[in-house]
Amino acid sequence: FNKLIDEYNNNTIKNNYMDDIIEASKEYIKNHFSEDINVNNIASLFAVSPTYFSRLFKKEVGVPPVVFINKYRMERACSYFDETDFTVKEVAELCGYSDPFYFSKAFKSIVGVPPKEYRLRNSCKNSI
C-alpha cells in the first residue's frame, strides 16, 4: 500500500513539474515572441531535450510549440495592425520576423489574408 502511495506521489510531482514546464514555456513565448526564439532555446531553459519538450508541449497544448509561437506572433501582429499605423515591415520586426516577405507569407497562411488586406478590412470595420 505504501508503495502505491509513493508511486502516486511521484507521478503527481512529475505531472505537476510537466504542467509547470508547459505554463512557464507559454509565458516565456508570450514575453519573448519578438525575439529569435525556437524549440531548442525553450527546451534548454528547462534542461530537457528539444524532442521531449516538443512532444510534451503538443500533448498538453494540442499543437507543436512552433505552431503556438507562430500563432501567438500573428495574434500580436493583428493587434498591431488594429491599434497602430505601423508598416508591415515594422510589425514584422516587432513580431520577431527579420524578413517582411516571409512574415507576409506566414501571416496569410495563419490569418487567411495578406497583412495589407487584413488592415484594409479592419479599418473599414473600425470606421463604421
What feature does the model see in each segment?
Residues 1-12, 50-52:
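An amphipathic alpha-helical interaction segment
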Residues 11, 15-19, 36-39, 46:
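Conserved phosphate/pyrophosphate-binding and hydrolysis machinery centered on Walker-type P-loop NTPases
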Residues 18-22, 88:
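The cytosolic transmitter module of two-component sensor histidine kinases
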Residues 26-27, 31, 36, 40, ...:
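Terminal helix-turn-helix DNA-binding modules in bacterial transcription factors
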Residues 49-50, 98-99:
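Short coil turns linking two alpha-helices in DNA-binding domains
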Residues 52-53, 57, 102-103, 107:
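Short hydrophobic/aromatic patch on the recognition helix
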Residues 105-128:
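…primarily DNA-binding HTH/wHTH and HhH modules…
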